[in-house]
Amino acid sequence: MDSLQDTVPLDHGGCCPALSRLVPRGFGTEMWTLFALSGPLFLFQVLTFMIYIVSTVFCGHLGKVELASVTLAVAFVNVCGVSVGVGLSSACDTLMSQSFGSPNKKHVGVILQRGALVLLLCCLPCWALFLNTQHILLLFRQDPEVSRLTQDYVMIFIPGLPVIFLYNLLAKYLQNQKITWPQVLSGVVGNCVNGVANYALVSVLNLGVRGSAYANIISQFAQTVFLLLYIVLKKLHLETWAGWSSQCLQDWGPFFSLAVPSMLMICVEWWAYEIGSFLMGLLSVVDLSAQAVIYEVATVTYMRHSHHLAYTAHVARIPLGLSIGVCVRVGMALGAADTVQAKRSAVSGVLSIVGISLVLGTLISILKNQLGHIFTNDEDVIALVSQVLPVYSVFHVFEAICCVYGGVLRGTGKQAFGAAVNAITYYIIGLPLGILLTFVVRMRIMGLWLGMLACVFLATAAFVAYTARLDWKLAAEEAKKHSGQQQQQQRAESTATRSGPEKAVLSSVATGSSPGITLTTYSRSECHVDLFRTPEEAHTLSAPTSRLSVKQLVIRRGAALGAASATLMVGLTVRILATRH
């Protein structure tokens, strides 16, 4: 296991020796490299979340019920759809960055294809829940009128789910190659379309919440199509795309071994905040509206892993952009077996976000009385927001640090640890404490955020301790597997073993009591074949890496499609039966 001193040379100079011991050598250069990478990603995330902010602003000025409906609709879509897809696709952060840093760059295209297939399958069970939005919300004692409007929004949003998944996947495909500006351009296009669509559908045609949902769908399609066309027309795929390959149907096991922990790492945290929204809905429309406004404030200041409104409470733009940048830099360095650079990127990213989050947290506290006016005219909501924002400003500092550590974990392929930490801190500590303070102590929305503050503080401590003891050399070895380098080597050895002779050399060798026996030996420049190897040994050496046959692929992938389709049919059946009663 490599210590900080073993892996990253430290700069002991300067006027503050104690501080310099924490700063790796080359910190300044690495910090600017991270900012150059994360800067466009920051803009991209701002533009992406602006779509939801604009929609919320339009609906917020329609009334409390409309604002609450949009908030719940987006929360429901997040919990039951976007969070799952974004979590599973986060495996691509590990696989794509490490593959692009390795000599096997074409493997990035295979990962893109594999990820697209997996995410499309995920849409089917998510849609099953979307069909029953109103009934689920009523089970949680949500307001009937709010639940009805929420169902309208979610039903309209159904075709937008695979579009969001594809857009997220294309963005990861580019950013893990250090290509960032096309995402910004697509975000500009999406926001322009969204602004015009919201004005036309909500303000002019008076379609209300339904108009906002239609505007959201239109803008999602516009920016996704633009990004896809940009990649093709500018030929950004040439270095990593070798065409459609049946290999994307192989190796789903290793993909899910990263995808499931990635999903849990994100979703257990994401769901905790969405549960907070549902809890606020149990209190009053004012508390729920205040929660929505705080989420939006968080969107502008923090922004984390995904593309949706309600996730904004624990997401802040700059930390998210820096987290992605750290993930890319760490993953590419490990793919190239450069552990020194990988750890330098990790340490530099964490130190940078500490300073940035302190500045942002201070600004939030200073502007606590002004921020609420941006999103609503309701004085009760504005007053409640101003009370909670000081707590959120402290929360933001620790959550921002956790966000960047999440990038380190994704870059190293250690999402399983992140999932475990989030599950414990949010569901065993944070949420129970928040519920206790909210409903028993009667602190209402303030109690929820105090519970979340305790949660992120403990999570930060766990991430710091874990990464300080991380074995970076082992992580580099694992990166070889993720990037397909070991499989390539094994296939090359297998092919060399099975190939015919490159040339024959006749020689006389003495074999025991029979001197002068002439044997023909075969040799290749890259390997030497032992003619005396037993059949079992030869089979062991020449056996290719585990690949499924065509029959096995049809059975297994067909079973996956059948299971996903069956889930959708169950959801449709439940909706029909529930509607009749």
From Swiss-Prot:
It is found in: Cell membrane; Apical cell membrane. Keywords: Antiport, Cell membrane, Membrane, Transmembrane, Transmembrane helix, Transport. The lineage of its organism: Eukaryota, Metazoa, Chordata, Craniata, Vertebrata. GO terms for biological process: organic cation transport; xenobiotic detoxification by transmembrane export across the plasma membrane. Residues 1-33, 88-119, 175-183, 234-253, 339-346, 402-420, 466-557 are cytoplasmic. Belongs to the multi antimicrobial extrusion (MATE) (TC 2.A.66.1) family. This is Multidrug and toxin extrusion protein 2. GO terms for cellular component: apical plasma membrane; plasma membrane. It is a multi-pass membrane protein. Its main location: membrane. Residues 55-66, 141-153, 205-212, 274-317, 368-380, 442-444, 579-581 are extracellular. Residues 481-513 are annotated as: Disordered.
